[in-house]
């Protein structure tokens, strides 16, 4: 073969190979594009059609230069759709309470900007717990903190932070309020916020960050609500509200709310004589509240709420060891399951209790006449027997000589049961402590446990001599 023939032969072979490579590239390109659009076709819904997100298997072909690699399998993870809470699990069996959280707000305010607050509480969404309080529109180290012992001003707002985070300057102000309640229905937060003139206040109902409904004071005498969490079952939330005399006959109503809209209002019925500042918990299929009688009884009123037919039944905690302050000492106190005990009935403090079969768990101040110290215990047959005074599983939360304040309950749903937790308000400043001109609080939080636990005391702990006056 002469040189010219060799050149022609090599050229022909090269041209043939180039042509084959060219067609291979086109085939690979067509295959890749076809697979891409087929995947889009299988995974995209038609226009205007809602497609539910479900776990699916997606095949993706990855092309690198001209080589088609192995097919990989990837599992798409879809977010779980939000559902209304129904609280149908049983109550957890507990032996007592274990420490959970403490915010140390007053101690921290000695060196930083922390809000002046009172009336704190805790409530949880399905994932996290949050602490709430009514701010006074000022920080402690601010001259506006003078005379913040006042309950109702137009500057008070509802504050909300993740539990354990003190109310710093970056804290969200949820609404304007000098009385409030909050709860999560499984999809969004509901906030009940009361503000305005004592004789013509407004309650705003804020759901998912939007004002949905409102109601005006019906008795023109300081409309007020729970100062702790409300409860939602299957999308219906209940909140107890009172308007009228603080030491006499008042007008209490239970409001039923769906996504922020008031759908029904029931009047208090039953034997409770005076109901304020209820601490409520889910007791499927209804809601149960233990409240404050500021008129006749140092035994606490009970309000049972039927979600389905909106009926209300009220009575009193039977236990011969009573839970309000002031009260008689335990050796001389008495109780009644239906009526107030007419012992040290005037005044009072927000508190809590919950049933455990025929027994009752409760918390109260250790001092019988003032808001000092805090203890919890179980009264055997305390839910059914007015003569019951057998106290077991007692725990000291705050020593007798240290200040306490309001306390309330909140519920946390676990995998198999619903746990009960409580918080204690640790008030500092005026009127009792005159070294400073302000009144504020921190909190300590405990939750039910089926395990073992030790002893201690968890007071506020701030040295007011180191604080802003």
Predicted segments with their positions:
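Beta-propeller and closely related beta-sheet repeat lectin domains
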Residues: 120, 179-181, 226-229, 276-279, ...
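Beta-rich carbohydrate-recognition and catalytic domains
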Residues: 79-113, 118-129, 133-173, 184-223, ...
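Aromatic (phenylalanine/tyrosine) cluster motif
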Residues: 22-23, 40-42, 205, 410, ...
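Surface-exposed, short loops/turns at beta-strand junctions within beta-sandwich domains
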Residues: 232, 414-418
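Membrane-proximal alpha-helical anchors
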Residues: 32-51, 80
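Serine/threonine-rich low-complexity intrinsically disordered regions
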Residues: 52-77, 174
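Single-pass membrane-anchoring alpha-helices
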Residues: 2-38
């Amino acid at each position: 073969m002469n040189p010219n023939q060799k050149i022609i032969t090599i050229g022909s072979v090269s041209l043939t190979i180039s042509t084959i490579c060219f067609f291979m590239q086109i085939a690979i390109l067509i295959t890749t594009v076809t697979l891409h659009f087929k995947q889009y076709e299988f995974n995209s819904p038609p226009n205007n059609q809602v497609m539910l997100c479900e776990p699916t298997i997606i095949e993706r072909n990855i092309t690198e230069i001209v080589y088609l690699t192995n097919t990989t399998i990837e599992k798409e993870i879809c977010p779980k759709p939000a559902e209304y809470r129904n609280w149908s699990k049983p109550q957890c069996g507990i032996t007592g309470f274990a420490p959970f959280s403490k915010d140390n707000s007053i101690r921290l305010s000695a060196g930083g900007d922390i809000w002046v607050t009172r009336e704190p509480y805790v409530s949880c969404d399905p994932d996290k717990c949050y602490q709430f309080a009514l701010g006074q529109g000022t920080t402690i180290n601010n001259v506006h903190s003078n005379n913040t012992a006042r309950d109702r001003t137009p500057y008070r707002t509802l504050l909300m932070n993740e539990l354990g985070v003190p109310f710093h300057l970056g804290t969200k102000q949820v609404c304007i309020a000098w009385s409030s309640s909050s709860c999560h229905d499984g999809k969004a937060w509901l906030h009940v916020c009361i503000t305005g003139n004592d004789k013509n206040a407004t309650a705003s109902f804020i759901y998912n960050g939007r004002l949905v409904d409102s109601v005006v004071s019906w008795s023109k005498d300081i409309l007020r609500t729970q100062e702790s969490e409300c409860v939602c079952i299957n999308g219906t939330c209940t909140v107890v509200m009172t308007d009228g005399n603080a030491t006499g006959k008042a007008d209490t109503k239970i409001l039923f709310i769906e996504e922020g809209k008031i759908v029904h209002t029931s009047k208090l019925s039953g034997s409770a004589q005076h109901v304020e500042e209820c601490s409520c918990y889910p007791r499927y299929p209804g809601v149960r509240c233990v409240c404050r009688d500021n008129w006749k009884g140092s035994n606490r009123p009970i309000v049972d709420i039927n979600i389905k037919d909106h009926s209300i039944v009220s009575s009193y905690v039977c236990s011969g060891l009573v839970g309000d302050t002031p009260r008689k000492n335990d050796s001389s106190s008495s109780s009644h399951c239906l009526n107030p005990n007419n012992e040290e009935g005037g005044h009072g403090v927000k508190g809590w209790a919950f049933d455990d079969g025929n027994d009752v768990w409760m918390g109260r101040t250790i001092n019988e006449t003032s808001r000092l110290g805090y203890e919890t215990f179980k009264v055997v047959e305390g839910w059914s027997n007015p003569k019951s005074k057998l106290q077991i599983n007692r725990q000291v939360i705050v020593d007798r000589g240290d200040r306490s304040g309001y306390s309330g309950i909140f519920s946390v749903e676990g995998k198999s049961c619903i746990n009960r937790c409580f918080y204690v308000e640790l008030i500092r400043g005026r009127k009792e402590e005159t070294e400073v001109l302000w009144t504020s609080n921190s909190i300590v939080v405990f939750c039910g446990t089926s395990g073992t636990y030790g002893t201690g005391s968890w007071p506020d702990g701030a040295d007011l001599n180191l604080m802003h006056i």
